[in-house]
């Protein structure tokens, strides 16, 4: 059946899927930092708690981490914790009077001369990027205050100064963000603040880093180096926020554990109408190689202050699911919004509805046809297990995986049922929260040797499937696990009728 034939058969009157494949990342802020508020978010559908290190002190984020863990423990859940770095930024300096108003047609000079750092005026103000005059040529644009104010460069006055034409009305205040669309920007991946934040994250045992403004694969490696030996198991999710990141996406994906399509800054750095193209391309590339991908920014933004989303926002979330995103993310909606629980519940419902419109077998065949032959044995086993799940219409898949690699490989091939991963590592439980369809179950391996506890772990997973109503007595569950007499990869697939 083609995608078009599948779409024709869709009906709003059919029951929706019993499980939600897509995961939800929630930004934690004043509206949701308490243990009780976090418990409500978790009950509503939060999988990963995001801390935005552009704001707040280490003490503030320490409280968030403690509260997330306390709330998760009370509910018996394994919630991932993500540290989102501030990243390298370009900003204006200070203004002599605190703010300046501009009108269309005004002429202003921008300078990298430190003498103007704290005494900006309507005629001249400071930008803290020393290479500014080399990066932007006459005719180019400078976006100020996250793109709200635009300047067109008229001429280069000297090695530190550009004369610019103001394109629109705006009241500009201190330390506003600068974007240089289409320009090659040379900034370090890890600022001094980022380095301290990463050290804090390692000490606190966060599960993943959302690395901001990644432009090259080398910058991903810089973040990995900053995490050090103690942080070697932390996932790095690279945020794509500018044209350089899009241009270098293949090597960035290879160097990263996952990708975030951060559409806010991306929509400033490239034309807004091209963001949907970048989003679909990046998500598809991640799908082909089996790396988790998050779609973020302005997804249900109106619910920061309104109890219901706009129809366009609903379509946006659904489109991210249809594109193939593993996760969708909420920012201010949960950090400072009036309706944090409602927005997560709404997003969860949208994701489930959008699942019905995805043609899973088409996705499976497309991904498999794009793989290089010969496959590695582990991937061959996992892809064959997914094929079996489609053929027998399995209600669930069960995988025994300590690192989560096998669970991710199974997820890569997009089965249309939940993937229950029984693991002996709590960190694996939390990190798999960014992987589509995977639900983790922790097994305490200290009770017995690994060879002896295999069937106990299988039973634990089957009992969990029944308890959570993923499957019922008589339903088929596809089980994937290793035979420890043959080392190296999970080489057994079993079809079990749930007792």
Curated annotation (Swiss-Prot):
Highest taxon in the source lineage: Eukaryota
EC number, UniProt record: 2.7.1.40
Recorded catalytic activity of this chain's protein: pyruvate + ATP = phosphoenolpyruvate + ADP + H(+)
Regulation: Activated by fructose 2,6-bisphosphate, activated by the effector in a cooperative manner.
Binding sites annotated in the UniProt record for substrate: 50, 264-265, 297
Binding site for ATP: 52-55, 91
Broad EC category: transferase
Pathway linked to the protein: Carbohydrate degradation; glycolysis; pyruvate from D-glyceraldehyde 3-phosphate: step 5/5
Residues reported to bind Mg(2+): 241, 265
Keywords in alphabetical order: Allosteric enzyme, ATP-binding, Glycolysis, Kinase, Magnesium, Metal-binding, Nucleotide-binding, Potassium, Pyruvate, Transferase
InterPro entries: Pyr_Knase, Pyrv/PenolPyrv_kinase-like_dom, Pyrv_kinase-like_dom_sf, Pyrv_Knase-like_insert_dom_sf, Pyrv_Knase_AS, Pyrv_Knase_brl, Pyrv_Knase_C, Pyrv_Knase_C_sf
Site (Transition state stabilizer) residue list: 239
UniProt: K(+) binding residues: 52, 54, 84-85
Family label: Belongs to the pyruvate kinase family.
Known partners and oligomeric status: Homotetramer.
Protein name in the entry: Pyruvate kinase 1
Organism: Trypanosoma brucei brucei
Gene assigned in the entry: PYK1
